[in-house]
Amino acid sequence: MSLPIIKVHWLDHSRAFRLLWLLDHLNLEYEIVPYKRDANFRAPPELKKIHPLGRSPLLEVQDRETGKKKILAESGFIFQYVLQHFDHSHVLMSEDADIADQINYYLFYVEGSLQPPLMIEFILSKVKDSGMPFPISYLARKVADKISQAYSSGEVKNQFDFVEGEISKNNGYLVDGKLSGADILMSFPLQMAFERKFAAPEDYPAISKWLKTITSEESYAASKEKARALGSNF
């Protein structure tokens, strides 16, 4: 049975890079349909023609025989679908049911627990750097700092402490001491947190080493080149 036609609806400067990496690591053939952000860094309306929410990534899967299409949204669900339907050699998903459960857990953990406090910190950083006139800028920074201190910065630490512990006890990876779909999906928010100084790499040596290890994969380099060709820099 032949594999379906796979299309990635790609938005520049987005987390869709992880999907390219996943597909490349599994040696799957796919087409990239690119979209550009507007002057306000928003997704273009064309994406809403593919999915009502107009977000990226979106994965289009078309049966070669019937022509029937599926549009998949939400990164965790897309990863779960790809691993379930296309990773027949168990390259990034384990045959062991218990290990597979652990991998699937992280596919939901990323957006459900890790990403929210990081997104709050990101929004607060934008508030502080918004260029508002004094004294509004002073008050905005004070409010942003209070929110960060009361919730998001502490929750970022809580999440990073958890991930640090998981990698430390699993021989340098999230699950079972080897690369899985969970590692690929988790890479982006942890990288961005370090780059935006929401967490310090020196405080999390296991995460730092893990990032260096997984980004040395040939599939990462191949996907990075594709992203650069599309106008994104990772």
Swiss-Prot record:
Its EC number is 2.5.1.18. Its main location: endoplasmic reticulum. Residues 96-234 form the GST C-terminal domain. It catalyses: RX + glutathione = an S-substituted glutathione + a halide anion + H(+). It holds the Pfam family GST_C. Keywords: Endoplasmic reticulum, Membrane, Transferase. Homodimer. The keyword Lipoprotein does not apply. Coiled coil: none annotated. It is a peripheral membrane protein. InterPro entries: Glutathione-S-Trfase_C-like (IPR010987), Glutathione-S-Trfase_C_sf (IPR036282), Glutathione_S-Trfase (IPR040079), Glutathione_S-Trfase_N (IPR004045), GST_C (IPR004046), Thioredoxin-like_sf (IPR036249). Residues 3-90 form the GST N-terminal domain. GO terms for cellular component: cell periphery; cytoplasm; endoplasmic reticulum; endoplasmic reticulum membrane; mitochondrial outer membrane; mitochondrion; plasma membrane. It comes from Saccharomyces cerevisiae (strain ATCC 204508 / S288c) (Baker's yeast). GO terms for molecular function: glutathione peroxidase activity; glutathione transferase activity. GO terms for biological process: glutathione metabolic process. It is found in: Endoplasmic reticulum membrane. Belongs to the GST superfamily. PROSITE patterns: GST_CTER, GST_NTER. The keyword Glycoprotein does not apply. This is Glutathione S-transferase 1. It is an enzyme of class 2 (transferase).
